[in-house]
Amino acid sequence: MTSGEAERLRLTHLDHCRRHKCFARGSGEFCYFELPEEHIEGPAHGVRLTTQVELTRSLIREFTKRPLLVERERGPCVLTVVCNCPNPGLHQDLCCHLCAEYNKYRN
């Protein structure tokens, strides 16, 4: 499967996904992979998302004598969903499960 096909499936997922924090909207690196039979986890196939480092800042103004700056750094993170069915391919539900895991990570 080419990277173009994986990108097309990512866009298909984006079209029907109603999650506020969909992985397909982000800037992470999405890819499809296949593991050969001789691999320790093979034969298998799946999808992987590598997120970028994310820095958020906020101010605490309540219950303090002075404003305090809070910084949160998250990432990079690698999320992988592996399928070991006998029919290798980029199944649409792999993207849905990856999106669910992405939302667990983001919350």
Curated annotation (Swiss-Prot):
Organism superkingdom: Viruses
Keywords, in A-Z order: Early protein
InterPro entries: Adeno_E3A
Protein family according to the UniProt entry: Belongs to the adenoviridae E3A-2 family.
Name recorded for this polypeptide: Early E3A 12.5 kDa protein
Organism, scientific name: Human adenovirus C serotype 2 (HAdV-2)
